[in-house]
């Protein structure tokens, strides 16, 4: 009986560990289930891709996960069309079109894609080296990876590590993941294959 119970417990532990190490999709390719729109900018699905596009108000817009995420690895692909000024926010909250949190930048060439910016706070916390910014394929599909664990954040672009930051304030942050469309109009960004693995 004891051996049977021990075997069952071991199976449960193995199953739990395996589940915690799995990537899951944040975007189903059909609609915006699991997400919430903030602002009047356009967020829609086209041919299995998530589209962010400037609206008539030309203001900031955000698409946030309804679920908060603390420690995780996030992978995604993005393609910048027109002015591709955007970003991925971590441990963030949004009220109206004002976001509180930290952004992993997505921008046109030589404007610090992969760097980390604190909105309505300290501003740029870290920028990538100029030579590393050459990893951006503007107008093409790019692969981004973001790891957030405790007070550490690391970003990669097309396999190239862009920045690594340790920050106590980020470590205390709480909130969800948000995609941004920048104010000013004329912006369009495509997203696909948004996947996340939660870390303990």
Predicted regions span which residues?
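Sec-dependent N-terminal signal peptides
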Residues: 4-14
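Carbohydrate-interacting regions of secretory-pathway proteins
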Residues: 19-200
């Amino acid at each position: 009986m004891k051996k049977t119970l021990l075997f069952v417990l071991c199976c449960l532990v193995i199953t739990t560990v395996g589940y915690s190490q799995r990537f899951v999709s944040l975007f189903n390719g059909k609609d915006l289930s699991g997400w919430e729109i903030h602002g009047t900018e356009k967020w829609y699905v086209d041919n299995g891709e998530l589209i962010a596009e400037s609206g008539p108000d030309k203001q900031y817009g955000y698409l946030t996960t309804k679920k908060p995420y603390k420690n995780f690895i996030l992978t995604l692909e993005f393609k910048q069309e027109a002015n591709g000024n955007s970003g991925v926010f971590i441990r963030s909250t949004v009220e109206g079109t004002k976001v509180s949190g930290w952004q992993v930048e997505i921008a046109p060439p030589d404007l610090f894609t992969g760097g980390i910016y604190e909105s309505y706070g300290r501003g740029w916390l870290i920028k990538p080296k100029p030579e590393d910014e050459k990893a951006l394929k503007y107008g093409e599909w790019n692969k981004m990876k973001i790891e957030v664990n405790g007070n550490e954040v690391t970003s990669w672009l097309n396999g190239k590590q862009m920045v690594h930051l340790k920050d106590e304030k980020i470590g205390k942050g709480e909130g969800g993941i948000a995609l941004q469309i920048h104010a000013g109009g004329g912006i369009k960004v495509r997203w696909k294959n948004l996947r996340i693995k939660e870390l303990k």
